[in-house]
Amino acid sequence: MTLRLQINGAPREFASRLTVQGLVAELGVAGKRIAIERNGEIVPRSQYGAVQLADGDKLEVVVAVGGG
């Protein structure tokens, strides 16, 4: 089964089902300060491992960058 997601406006395909936590690892942003919105709703960090992504989900992934 191919999982088709839209991430920051771009289509992406993954070979298997993913949780938000799995997606974070796939995108290489684990350990960074991030915010994830799924279909218009913010996903709390405490729920990353429990929220299963579905084919067609639209996600916005924002990585915080420090500066001054």
Locate the predicted segments by residue.
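Ubiquitin-like/PB1-type beta-grasp interaction modules and other compact soluble beta-rich domains
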Residues: 1-67
